[in-house]
């Protein structure tokens, strides 16, 4: 009987034996799955030295072969009882959980090795591939054992049970080798079998697939069947003496089945050995467990290179292909990136025909563009590391149409124009790879030396530099040429600023407004704003005139002239006003020769009014070489070399025009002081003074005499000492004195006009008194307060006595020499009057001005009161 025919017969016999064994032992043992087992001892792990609480269910034994793992918490399989079957439980099975800190043996499917970037030497040919799914934990309430379980596929089947993976509420927590383990077991769930994640092995190495935990070989006997896909590789009983039922003839040479532990090994792995391996554990037909292993077989990482090594193409070409040499099937996963960014997902996602796509070991770039100029990298990655190779792709293009830009050291917007005299720079740029060669064609054909390059400098441009400039760009790689033109405009701003004025027309019946800004290239455009409707206000070049009928409503209305030029836009404003509050102000200035120049300025006389000047009622005729002259607008009269003997007197001005008239007059007098005061300060003297409106003064001299002049003695100018010289606008001065011995000082103020002294002020004497100390000041304050207190007490006593005297009625006879009563009450209250007796003769030093008054005047003679 061959192996395929013997396998079903063996399965049937194993099921019958398991059922009979189960029924025979159902009355001998009972297990309460809802009770919790407490651990009363600790067992030391053989490999790690970890203390694990031992769990002692009745008559459980752990075979010696299960203790080979480095850290184990073993729980023997229990027999199945009818009580358990009647409660919808197919039975419980216990598994060995092996852990070694956080790392297991290299061949264990549970081990998880972090993937490194490059593995030039592979020391372990079999490593678990990274599992992107997170691990889960299983917790059983009774056994108080915990460990970390990686992701695995596990199915448990029992013909007579209602067990499902949803019934398990399991949690296993991985701890360090020195930590303690605890586990709890639910009464309604059995401990699950577990396997590791996907395995990765190199070609020629051994694939080892273990069963973890190792099934209990005790009765009933377990049957293990290994498959790859639907093909049976090996089948046999689990245990040292169990028969081997089947072994795949095609893999007999390199296939080994360890029946003691259920481990399947395939030596000299090839690429076609990759796939999903399944292990089925059948125990007498009562339960069935399925373990799945995903195995990947890889060749060693190859040496890579990209061909061509320096790829070049032009923008708009049909295609460009890059090949990753050294890669082949089974050598890992191939991917492409551009400047470190993955290409496949970004380029092909959502595109019907992606412009970049991978075809085998090649990268195809359809219709390359300039942005494809980058560094391309092919990368091969496997669980054993990765390798990569790169190449720089050059995409030539251009030139694009050149762009000419203008910059000037004076102009903010030179693209429209540049001002004459400025330094102008022309720059030409054209997008091109490789960079394009730039040449210029100037507007001036007489210019022979034209420099090559992207920048053209035009220093101090003038009208001759205006015109058209051409920039030519040529790509030496593609052979293409492009040309662009620029029209350069050179503008010359008119000098100065626009000037506005208004004057009266003939007979003061109209107002004539004028705006001018001559010169410049091109000429400025002038236009009035604010004129009444119907008046022509421009625009006109250079000079603009406008006549408006005179009307009082024009007074105070600003008229603006807007002057536009290529370089700048400027304005000037004139406001016609009627004369109002005309006032003359004298101004004094001193020349270098010491002469005084007096100017009379008329305020409140705006244009279009005209000023007419007169002295003592006679019109003045300035000019003609005389000392009198007028300002340009006629509102200021200048009198040169002013003389106190000839030029003093009355001056007047009359402002008249189309909008009204007004005037003012002033009397010019020599320098003098109208009044002044001398105040005392600490270690200083303070002087303040005033002058009259028409007084002409160019400076003030503060003069002093240290000891003061004798009474009746006349003093000259030389006897006084000048302490300070102040300007004509000053009206006060502070003169510091010696702090220790200030003494007696005599001060006066001398006004001066040019070099001509005026009338000095009256002299005042400054006497410095003794300065009180802080103690004296405090004594004065305290004495004042005490005096006020005594005065208040005396006043209170007087009030009390007065109230007492008023309460008594005197019955004494009237004295014949009684004076007028102090208080004159009405006739009905004569009993309250107190007479005053004075000894004669009475010498009154206070005159009695009004005898009818009710006031009583106090005399210096003794006064006797009748009580």
Curated annotation (Swiss-Prot):
Disulfide topology: 324-378, 428-471
Region (Disordered): 35-60, 104-186, 602-627
Keyword Signal (UniProt): yes
Skewed-composition ranges (Polar residues): 137-153, 173-186
Subcellular location: Membrane
PROSITE patterns, per database record: IG_LIKE
Residues of this chain annotated as glycosylated in UniProt: 32, 88, 96, 144, 423, 487, 641, 650
Major localization listed first in the record, in broad terms: membrane
Transmembrane residue ranges: 777-797
Membrane topology designation: Single-pass type I membrane protein
Cytoplasmic topological segments: 798-867
Keywords (A to Z) from UniProt: Disulfide bond, Glycoprotein, Immunoglobulin domain, Membrane, Repeat, Signal, Transmembrane, Transmembrane helix
UniProt signal peptide: 1-27
Biased composition (Basic and acidic residues): 159-170
Residue ranges that the UniProt entry lists as topological domain Extracellular: 28-776
Biased composition (Low complexity): 35-45
Presence of the UniProt keyword Translocase in the record: no
Organism superkingdom: Eukaryota
Domain Ig-like C2-type: 302-394, 402-487
GO cellular component: membrane; nucleoplasm
Tissues expressed in: Expressed in the esophagus, particularly in the suprabasilar layers of the epithelium. Expression is largely reduced in esophageal metaplasia, dysplasia, and adenocarcinoma lesions.
Protein name per its UniProtKB record: V-set and immunoglobulin domain-containing protein 10-like
Organism: Homo sapiens
């Amino acid at each position: 009987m061959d192996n395929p025919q013997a396998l079903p017969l063996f399965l049937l016999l194993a099921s019958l034996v398991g059922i009979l064994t189960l029924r025979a032992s159902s009355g001998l043992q009972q297990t309460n799955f809802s009770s919790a087992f407490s651990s009363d001892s600790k067992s030391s792990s053989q490999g790690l030295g970890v203390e694990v609480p031992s769990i002692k269910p009745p008559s459980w034994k752990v075979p010696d072969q299960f203790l080979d793992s480095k850290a184990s918490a073993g729980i023997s399989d229990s027999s199945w009882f009818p009580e358990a079957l009647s409660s919808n439980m197919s039975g419980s099975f216990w598994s060995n959980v092996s852990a070694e800190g956080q790392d297991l043996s290299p061949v264990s499917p549970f081990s998880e090795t972090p993937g490194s970037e490059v593995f030039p030497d592979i020391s372990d040919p079999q490593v678990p591939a990274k599992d992107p799914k997170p691990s889960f934990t299983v917790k059983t309430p009774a056994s108080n054992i915990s460990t970390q379980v990686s992701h695995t596929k596990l199915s448990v089947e029992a013909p007579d049970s209602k067990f499902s993976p949803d019934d398990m509420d399991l949690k296993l927590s991985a701890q360090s080798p020195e930590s303690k383990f605890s586990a709890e077991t639910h009464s309604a769930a059995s401990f699950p079998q577990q396997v590791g994640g996907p395995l990765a092995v190199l070609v020629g190495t051994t694939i080892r697939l273990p069963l973890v935990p190792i099934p209990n070989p005790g009765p009933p006997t377990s049957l293990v069947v290994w498959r790859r896909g639907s093909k049976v590789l090996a089948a046999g009983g689990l245990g040292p003496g169990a028969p081997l039922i089947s072994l795949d003839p095609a893999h007999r040479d390199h296939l080994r089945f360890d029946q003691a532990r259920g481990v399947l090994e395939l030596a000299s792995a090839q690429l076609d050995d990759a796939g999903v391996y399944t292990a089925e554990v059948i125990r007498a037909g009562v339960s069935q467990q399925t373990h799945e292993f995903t195995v990947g077989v890889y060749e060693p990482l190859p040496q890579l290179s990209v061909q061509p090594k320096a790829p070049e193409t032009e923008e708009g070409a049909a295609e460009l292909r890059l090949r990753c040499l050294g890669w082949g099937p089974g050598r890992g996963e191939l991917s492409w990136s551009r400047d470190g960014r993955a290409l496949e997902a970004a380029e092909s996602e959502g595109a019907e025909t992606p412009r970049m796509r991978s075809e085998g070991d090649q990268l195809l770039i359809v219709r390359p563009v300039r942005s494809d100029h980058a560094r391309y990298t092919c990368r091969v990655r496997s669980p054993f590391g990765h390798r990569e190779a790169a190449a720089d792709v050059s995409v030539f293009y251009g030139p694009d149409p050149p762009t000419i830009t203008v910059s000037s050291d004076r102009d903010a917007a030179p693209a429209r124009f540049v001002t004459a005299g400025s330094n102008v720079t022309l720059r030409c740029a054209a997008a091109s790879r490789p960079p394009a060669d730039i040449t210029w064609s100037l507007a001036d054909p007489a210019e022979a030396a034209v420099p090559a390059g992207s920048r053209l400098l035009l220093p101090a441009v003038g009208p001759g530099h205006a015109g058209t400039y051409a920039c030519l760009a040529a790509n030496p790689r593609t052979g293409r040429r492009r040309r662009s033109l620029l029209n350069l405009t050179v503008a010359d701003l008119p000098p100065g600023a626009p000037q506005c004025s208004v004057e009266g027309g003939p007979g003061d019946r109209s107002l004539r407004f004028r705006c001018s800004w001559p010169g410049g290239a091109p000429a400025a455009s002038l236009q009035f704003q604010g004129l009444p409707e119907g008046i022509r206000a421009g625009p006109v070049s250079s000079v603009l005139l406008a006549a408006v009928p005179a009307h009082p409503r024009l007074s105070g209305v600003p008229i603006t002239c807007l002057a536009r030029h290529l370089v700048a836009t400027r304005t000037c404003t004139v406001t016609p006003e009627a004369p109002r509050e005309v006032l003359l102000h004298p101004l004094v200035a001193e020349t270098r020769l010491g002469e005084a120049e007096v100017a009379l300025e008329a305020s409140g006389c705006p244009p279009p009014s005209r000023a007419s000047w007169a002295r003592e009622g006679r019109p003045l005729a300035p000019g003609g070489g005389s000392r009198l002259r007028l300002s340009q607008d006629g509102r200021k009269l200048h009198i040169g070399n002013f003389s106190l003997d000839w030029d003093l007197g009355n001056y007047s001005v009359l402002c008249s025009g189309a909008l009204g008239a007004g005037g003012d007059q002033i009397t010019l007098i020599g320098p003098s002081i109208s009044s002044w005061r001398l105040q005392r300060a600490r270690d200083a003297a303070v002087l303040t003074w005033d002058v009259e409106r028409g007084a002409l003064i160019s400076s003030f001299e503060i003069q002093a005499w240290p000891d003061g002049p004798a009474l009746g003695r006349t003093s000259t100018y030389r006897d006084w000492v000048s302490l300070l010289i102040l300007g004509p606008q000053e009206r006060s001065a502070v003169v510091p004195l010696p702090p220790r011995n200030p003494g007696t000082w005599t001060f006066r103020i001398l006004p001066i006009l040019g070099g001509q002294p005026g009338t000095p002020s009256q002299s005042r004497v400054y006497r410095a008194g003794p300065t009180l100390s802080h103690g004296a000041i405090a004594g004065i304050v305290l004495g004042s307060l005490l005096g006020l207190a005594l005065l208040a007490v005396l006043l209170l006593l007087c009030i009390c006595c007065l109230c007492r005297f008023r309460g008594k009625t005197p019955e004494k006879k009237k004295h014949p020499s009684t004076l007028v009563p102090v208080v004159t009450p009405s006739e009905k209250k004569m009993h309250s009057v107190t007479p005053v007796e004075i000894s004669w003769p009475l010498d009154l030093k206070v005159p009695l001005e009004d005898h009818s008054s009710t006031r009583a005047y106090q005399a210096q003679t003794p006064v006797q009161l009748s009580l």
